[in-house]
Amino acid sequence: MQENLKNDKLKIGKYEFDSRFILGSGKYSLELIKSAIEEAKAQIITLALRRANTGEIANILDYIPKNITLLPNTSGARNADEALRIARLSRELGCGELIKIEVISDSRYLLPDNYETIKACELLAKEGFTPLPYMHADLYAARAMRDAGAAAIMPLAAPIGSNKGLCAKEFIQILLNEIDLPIIVDAGIGSPSQACEAMQMGVSAVMVNTAIAEAKDIALMARAFSLAVNAGRVAFLAGVASVSEAKASSPLTGFLRD
């Protein structure tokens, strides 16, 4: 069993990772990012391009260890063309070809635009990027993103920053059943228990930002999420018991009654 766990890798395109916990960085102070990464034992961290501006005095890239894989996002893009421009700038800054596609034109609810995201997947894949689209958990859109070149699908669990948990659980389960790509739950996860629940479903990884950034002790909460993600993954591999009616866990006959 230990050997199976050792060989249990998160595979995204040509990349492999031991950790299935992806850390967001959009709400941390720069000074806290390194300690959060260390406690999370994360190997991937997302970042917005605006925080990696090499012309600024404070550059987030200076606070991220060199052995951590960067997952820049296209935050701020309102359509596919804008997402492509941001991705190109990210690559010029040396952030690599992995890219999380975020296309959001709705400023009130901050919901991803699945239609423009599909277009962005195709554009970025043609230019050699490894796109990971952030999207609504919609089967038809997920199929289109897969066909357009997505390396993984990142459905939201609940509205971004809401900490409401697995509101889209049933729809995420459909993606797990039907899409042969890594499914990475992104947005809305508010507690370690919710992250564990997502991993028990069989998702490939969980990405968390707000729930850690708003904790009283950021580093300790990052550790809690890391443990929860690992526990959920091990539980999934072990085979979580199905829900049923009351059933005795010990024999009721053959002792006092005989």
From Swiss-Prot:
Enzyme Commission identifier(s): 2.8.1.10
Enzyme class: transferase
Transmembrane segments: none
Biological role stated in the UniProt entry: Catalyzes the rearrangement of 1-deoxy-D-xylulose 5-phosphate (DXP) to produce the thiazole phosphate moiety of thiamine. Sulfur is provided by the thiocarboxylate moiety of the carrier protein ThiS. In vitro, sulfur can be provided by H(2)S.
Catalytic activity: [ThiS sulfur-carrier protein]-C-terminal-Gly-aminoethanethioate + 2-iminoacetate + 1-deoxy-D-xylulose 5-phosphate = [ThiS sulfur-carrier protein]-C-terminal Gly-Gly + 2-[(2R,5Z)-2-carboxy-4-methylthiazol-5(2H)-ylidene]ethyl phosphate + 2 H2O + H(+)
Record's subcellular location: Cytoplasm
GO CC term (a single one): cytoplasm
Any one GO MF annotation of this record: thiazole synthase activity
GO biological process: thiamine diphosphate biosynthetic process
InterPro entries: Aldolase_TIM, Thiazole_synthase_ThiG, ThiG
Entry protein name: Thiazole synthase
Record-linked Gene3D superfamilies: Aldolase class I
Keyword flag Cell inner membrane: no
